[in-house]
Amino acid sequence: MNFRTTFAALLVAAGSLSLAQGCSSEDARSKPRSSGTSGMVFTADERGNSISVINLRTSMVETTPISVSPHNLQTSSDGRSLFAVGSPAEEGGDMTNAMDGPGRLLGFDAAAVSRGSVFDMAVGRKPAHVIVDRQGARAFVTNGGDNAISVIDLARRQTVKSIAVGKSPHGLRMSPDGNTIYVANTGDGTVSVINVRDLVEVVRIPVGKAPVQVAFTPNGRYSYVSLRDENSVAVVDTASRRMITKIPVGPGPIQLFALPSGREIYVANQGTEAMPGNTVSVIDTTSRKVIASIVTGAGAHGVVVSSGGDRVLISNTFANTVSVIDPVSRKVVENVPVGLGPGGITSRATKD
């Protein structure tokens, strides 16, 4: 097992190990430090076949090997469960997630990831992203190799439906009202809109070259779609279900996320492995223009906002770090080492 040491020397004395997840003395973790920010952040370490857990209050990191090369992960709305998707570990790790065989969906207790998964089930080919409905009853997984979305009953741990969408679906998000899911179809330049009640695709919206992920404004009026091969972000009016404009950003935009205020969208510009991007574009949602560019680590990929809304977290795929951004100053306040090849990123609140 390979674990990563972060921020300080490995803490040897067992009495000094204070991570609340009940991990063993073999785990490498950072020296605790106090912070005004709380919550937990999880990264899908695709090259390391692991999940890293960051305690935002202490900056302690725990990295746990798992049985897949996870591309993406997501917590449930109550923060109790964590779900990860990817290819079997012996097949993945090349950052493409391009295996032909079935992928896997793993479920974890979000407070005890180091104990291993509580379930492991097959999904479709080339799984990319996973989301969970508000009730925690169903999970939705994009299967890029099947051009479909798996709908999973989490109580029965069974796939109950496969929804046909566009070519090579990748990222997906549920609208704030929970009624629709927007799916970025990387292979055909469209976004599929799924009716959550009926579990059917109701429309397919043309947006541009290689859409990777979507983000909603908190009021649900607009969806922002990263267009990797155009170095831009498309803006979709969710009422008319039409694209209304495009906003130039940095090279190879991947994930994006709105601040709780809805005033700004943070876009991670990954670039390519040969020419990595290392910036985050900040879009003003009123002017629909980039108002700041923040330097992060190489291969800025995933974006999430902390549960308290006071930090923006960026996974840096080629730097093996997470950049912690203060959205007020728009500056990186910390770079946290995690596992190898962090891609997907998610967060949850804690009671501490």
Name each model-derived stretch.
Residues M1-A9:
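Bacterial N-terminal signal peptides that target proteins for export
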Residues T6, A13-S16:
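Alpha-helical hydrophobic membrane-insertion segments
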Residues L11, S18-D352:
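Predominantly soluble domains enriched in secretory-pathway, periplasmic, or organellar proteins
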